[in-house]
Amino acid sequence: MDAKLIIDNKLLDADNNATKDVFSPWEGQYLGTIPMASSQQAKAAISAADKAWQDWKLTTINTRINLLYKAADIIKSKREDLALSLCLEIGKNISEARSEIDRAREYIMMTADSAKSLRGSLYYGDVFDKYQKHQKTGLYSRYPLGVILAISPFNYPINLSITKIAPALVMGNTVVLKSATIGSLSSFQFYTCFIEAGFPLGVINFICGNASEVGDIMLTDKRVQLIAFTGSTEVGNHIREVSLGVPLLLELGGKDAALVLKDADLDYTAAQIVSGAFSYSGQRCTAQKIVFVESSIKGELIQKLVDSAANYSLSPLINAAAADYIEILKEDALTHGAKLVLASSRSGNKLSPAILAEVTEEMRLYHEEQFGPILPVVTINSISEGVNKIKDRKSTRLNSSHVSES
């Protein structure tokens, strides 16, 4: 299936018919093409959203809620087709793909349900110590911002776009979605459900294309009132620099740590860490990316990690370059003295899990977000040392966990 741009509810090819072929990370099979939008088309999408906002912001909230419900119903009817597209395009197994579609639909429903109770607020003077009720009255109303620019990543093109878009729509904002190039086929199919549901012209627009062509054009457009982005820290910092003070919602990369203490249940710990590190080949911003373990239990935990990881086989990374990066990090760590306790195998862009012990701060793997199936283990001598190492790392911290029975 070929994707199209969605601008003012029209399904369009890119200017000059510029396209990019899409191949599955599973076996390299051809899936279709995506249009590579021009800068003029990116601006046209924002223009459509800006024009549509003038009427959409005046639409009753019940109308918006009902349109979201209708979109959710259409998504439910197309669940298998949407899940299969996601599976083939970004390399998730079919169970993970179905889960993403289901979660997205449930999020739409939850957003619509929650919006029913979102109204203005009335406060009287007696909420403050110095005033009586009749002396002051405060009326607070909710007002939509305008055009929202949503930018989604390849690994959760549906979940991590709908969490930006559904709340924006129900509160009377209009949206331009810039999807990652990988994931655009699935995103296009998903968001045509909103057009089918009857969302008015220009309320939701879909753009895909090279960031060099359309990225800064959209980021610096003064009609954009908020930018919501999920992706790498590098790109997030660029957005912060060029966005001219526009409100930002940024979810960036993370080197997510687990701190394992000597009284932890190691069977439970190993199972949780391995699942967190290697599901979807570690291609998640919240994947477990480094383990700090007290020295007295290091050997036992590592063996349990190795045993648990043996249940994972070759799985695709999004492309060969991603697999190359994992191999580079592994070789750098081994060169600097790390010990390979679980060796990975590779076939093209597919990798099986690798676990490295004796990882230290001199190694790139200690600092860099690997976004793949390789897990570094660092030895510590106390909880305070572990906490300080987690806090002091140069890399970003999106989340952390600790395991202890005390």
Question: How does the language model describe each region?
Answer:
Residues 398-406:
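Single conserved hydrophobic/aromatic residue that forms the stacking wall/gate
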Residues 347-351, 368-374, 393-397:
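Conserved glycine-rich beta-strand-loop-beta hairpin in the small C-terminal domain of fold type I
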Residues 25-94, 296, 306-312:
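N-terminal alpha-helical segment of soluble enzymes
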Residues 57, 68-161, 199, 204:
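N-terminal Rossmann NAD(P)-binding subdomain characteristic of aldehyde/semialdehyde dehydrogenases
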Residues 28, 64, 86, 108, ...:
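Residue-level signal for inorganic ion chemistry
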Residues 1-33, 66, 70, 102, ...:
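Terminal low-complexity tails and localization/encapsulation signals of metabolic enzymes
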Residues 226, 234-361, 379-392:
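ALDH superfamily catalytic-core signature
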Residues 120-268, 380:
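Rossmann-like NAD(P) dinucleotide-binding subdomain of oxidoreductase/dehydrogenase enzymes
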